[in-house]
Amino acid sequence: MIRNSEDFSHHLSRESKAREKGPFQMLGRIKSSTGIDAISFSSGLPHPNKFAIRELSIKFPQLGCFKEENGTYAKEVNVTFNIKADPSEGLLNFSQSLQYGQCQGISELVGFIKEHIRRIHAPRYENWDIKMSNGNTSGLEYCLRLLVNYGDHVLTEKYTYPAAITAMRALGVQFVSVDMDSEGMLPESLEEIMRDWDISLGPRPHVLYTVPTGQNPTGSTLSLSRRKKLLALARKYDIIIVEDEPYYFLQMEDYNGSLNPAQQKCDGSTFLKSLVPSLLSLDTEGRVLRLDSFSKLIAPGTRLGYITGNSMFIDHITRIAEVCTESPSGICQSVLYAMLHNWGQEGFCAWLQELQYSYTVRRNAFLNVANKYLPNSVCIYHVPRAGLFLWVELNLNHYRFSDTKKSVSQIEMEIFLALVEKGVKTVCGQFFMANPERSTKIFFRFAYSIADFEDFEEGIKRFTSVINEHFNVESRVRICP
């Protein structure tokens, strides 16, 4: 028998505890006991006749035609939204989409996403819910305001998403960095931090922020066994986990040197079984808040995502949103729902498989070039098993100018500026650290998601030329781990 989540109200921040439901949201739920149709003078809604947007037409790939050639698809679906027309099957009322909307999200889209969550994660407690967000960065801020008071300590990976650092710092968060290896966050490091916590610093951290799959910036992916260990530690030390998963569906097979993936496309059920289980799917208590985004799956400009968690957390997040961002864009929700309804659950899985395949090809192509040119005496990296990034460490022992007594972060910035002069842009490792002055290693993050294939080789050549100028290079032969 599936039970409700545990009571985690003691984790709520002072802001969350102080927030009440907005009066206008409650007003909309009040109905006449007689069932009479009400004539409303209550809401200050603009009249639809004065909406300047009257019609919107979109195109998207037709189900079964997801493979693109030079940015075009063999068959596309044309959909038109008209403010005066009655909505057809699979379309939302466009006039209502342009009006002030429900803070949780448009009900039809919320319903589709909930079914998607049931198929993939099958939450193991009864009272879970979702809240539409404006993407994962917005979702993270909601979660922080839900859980964190000014001055609280929050656990993160040693290297983490820079926007998360910025969002936390503005809320007065004190960062506690957990060590990592090529597989991601180390449970042993987390255990040591929590077990040996110095109470003079304040209460032990009760929030952990992690990107478990295709981690940004390292590209690491937590194994199932490690995810279970993290959850066990969360239970032991009463930690709420914020699971940020924009790259979850971009999991990849092993790299073997060939360009095209060996695995052939399969049915939706087989595809879903190939994915490492999420922390949400392993959570039986309701202590995981999962962030999903359509930015990597549909387009970043939709500014749509969703938060999944226990209903108490979601209710309090909704209260924050009601006086902050309110509902996400009704236009974007309408467009997204038209696509997802047309494709259906199986079709959406097929689209996710196409993305997985496409980015695996990109990863393989980039690794082929990196293996060819990057000297293994200086450049150290592991094959990313998901996501969009290759994380390259530079061996400090081979730095030519070690007698200059520069700090690691200074050397890293020196190389970064030299790369810019050579016409190649990567991202410094220190940009992903809450406390870059403590850096002891040089890293650069490469995104293989956006550059043209034909630019991979020239870009890596330029990077290698800078390496040769700053490091003593012994070998160029590499067998990628």
From Swiss-Prot:
Keyword Transferase: yes
Any one GO cellular component localisation term in the record: nucleus
GO-annotated molecular function: 2-aminoadipate transaminase activity; aromatic-amino-acid transaminase activity; pyridoxal phosphate binding
Cellular compartments annotated: Cytoplasm
GO terms of biological process kind: aromatic amino acid family catabolic process; lysine biosynthetic process via aminoadipic acid; tyrosine biosynthetic process
Enzyme Commission code(s) on record: 2.6.1.57
Reaction equation(s) it catalyzes: an aromatic L-alpha-amino acid + 2-oxoglutarate = an aromatic oxo-acid + L-glutamate
InterPro entries recorded: Aminotransferase_I/II_large, Class-I_PLP-dep_aminotransf, PyrdxlP-dep_Trfase, PyrdxlP-dep_Trfase_major
Cofactor(s) listed: pyridoxal 5'-phosphate
A Pfam family: Aminotran_1_2
SUPFAM superfamilies: PLP-dependent transferases
Family: Belongs to the class-I pyridoxal-phosphate-dependent aminotransferase family.
Function summary: Has aromatic amino acid transaminase activity.
Protein name, per record: Aromatic amino acid aminotransferase C1773.13
